[in-house]
Amino acid sequence: MHEQYLPTGNEWVSLPTLQARTGALESFSFLHMGYKGLIEQRGAASLPLMAPFFELDGEKIPLQSLTWARKSDWIPTFHGIAGPLEVEGMLRAPVGERGFLYQLTVRSTLDGPLSGTFGLEGCWASAWHCVNEDKEIDGVRRCYTSLWNDSLIFDMR
């Protein structure tokens, strides 16, 4: 099956591989003048860089029936179902910002309380220098939450 993508981004960051079927983000890239090319962060073949997940009572619930639209003809948004949950998602790379965000909104279709969790999971498998040919960059990769603004930081040294 050929994957359909919904690319987006801004003048700083490119999000070329947002999967229409799953809402998973396979990679993102940015221009690095010191490297004179694009630096691309990629997920693994078995687990993308970022993918929405949903759990109820300790059991994973698949995200299904995604329908997509573009807010302001640019920002990819979706509606989907995960078991008894209605899910809305949006991937935004605001103009002028050197980053992006993946926003999820979840509503229960059931009466009464639910015990569950949702968020993003993934694997930062590799970093690549991309000009005419892609070359993997060696280094130690770390993801952590910024103490300054609680953002997720991708750090490679």
Regions found by a protein language model. Name each.
Residues M1-R157:
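Terminal accessory carbohydrate-recognition/targeting modules of carbohydrate-active enzymes
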